[in-house]
């Protein structure tokens, strides 16, 4: 079992129960899933770019990504409905905890000029979204084999009802919020 999950059960639950006055353990917010998304707009011209992006995402997440397709045709972007334009992965359970641990302790500190992540990127329901400009911050990605530096979106979905509860949950995991 992931160390972060054990830490959640032993320390975070007690800390949040005390802070928000929950009467049941089931009221305590928890991380439900982490979604990684990578949009590859250039995949219209070159299918190899999407394959490389999917391979990078599979390496980062540990599971095969789903290829996302365009929902509508947009003439300005020269895309048609059904064109493959990106990939996404939804992590739950053990892989989710492993990814969260690697994100907090290894990947984010490797970002150039890192001063913390924006504490205001919550959606109003306790879910946190952030973007990473380079996939090479993850140690699994070999810099020499990368054809192009791509970014990805990371969404952490929690069971928290408010942004305050979600922020407290992530802060309890020592998530590096900007001061």
From Swiss-Prot:
A matching Pfam family: Ribosomal_L5
Name the InterPro entries on file. Answer: Ribosomal_uL5, Ribosomal_uL5_bac-type, Ribosomal_uL5_C, Ribosomal_uL5_CS, Ribosomal_uL5_dom_sf, Ribosomal_uL5_N
Q: Name one GO biological process term.
A: translation
Keyword Transferase listed: no
Q: Name one GO cellular component term.
A: ribosome
Kindly state which keywords UniProt assigns to this record, in alphabetical order: Ribonucleoprotein, Ribosomal protein, RNA-binding, rRNA-binding, tRNA-binding
A molecular function GO annotation: tRNA binding
The source's superkingdom equals Bacteria
Instruction: State the disulfide connectivity.
Output: none
The UniProt entry's sequence similarity note says:
Belongs to the universal ribosomal protein uL5 family.
Per its UniProt record, what NCBIfam families does this chain match?
PRK00010.1 (NF000585)
List the PANTHER family. Answer: 60S RIBOSOMAL PROTEIN L11-RELATED
Q: Which HAMAP family match?
A: Ribosomal_uL5_B (MF_01333_B)
Subunit structure, per the record?
A: Part of the 50S ribosomal subunit; part of the 5S rRNA/L5/L18/L25 subcomplex. Contacts the 5S rRNA and the P site tRNA. Forms a bridge to the 30S subunit in the 70S ribosome.
Function per UniProt? This is one of the proteins that bind and probably mediate the attachment of the 5S RNA into the large ribosomal subunit, where it forms part of the central protuberance. In the 70S ribosome it contacts protein S13 of the 30S subunit (bridge B1b), connecting the 2 subunits; this bridge is implicated in subunit movement. Contacts the P site tRNA; the 5S rRNA and some of its associated proteins might help stabilize positioning of ribosome-bound tRNAs.
Q: What is this protein called?
A: Large ribosomal subunit protein uL5
Q: Which organism is it from?
A: Vibrio vulnificus (strain YJ016)
């Amino acid at each position: 079992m992931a160390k972060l999950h054990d830490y959640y059960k032993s320390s975070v639950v007690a800390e949040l129960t005390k802070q928000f006055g929950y009467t049941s353990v089931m009221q305590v917010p928890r991380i439900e899933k982490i979604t990684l998304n990578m949009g590859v707009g250039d995949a219209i011209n070159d299918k190899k770019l999407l394959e490389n992006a999917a391979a990078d995402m599979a390496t980062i997440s540990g599971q095969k990504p789903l290829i996302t397709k365009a929902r509508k045709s947009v003439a300005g972007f020269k895309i048609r409905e059904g064109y493959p334009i990106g990939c996404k992965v939804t992590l739950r359970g053990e892989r989710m905890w492993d990814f969260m641990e690697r994100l907090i302790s290894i990947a984010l500190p490797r970002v150039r000029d890192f001063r913390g992540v924006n504490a205001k990127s919550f959606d109003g329901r306790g879910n946190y979204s952030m973007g990473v400009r380079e996939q090479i911050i993850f140690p699994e990605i070999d810099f020499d084999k990368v054809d192009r530096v791509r970014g990805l979106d990371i969404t952490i979905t929690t069971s928290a009802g408010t942004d305050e509860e979600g922020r407290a949950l992530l802060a309890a995991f020592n998530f590096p919020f900007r001061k």
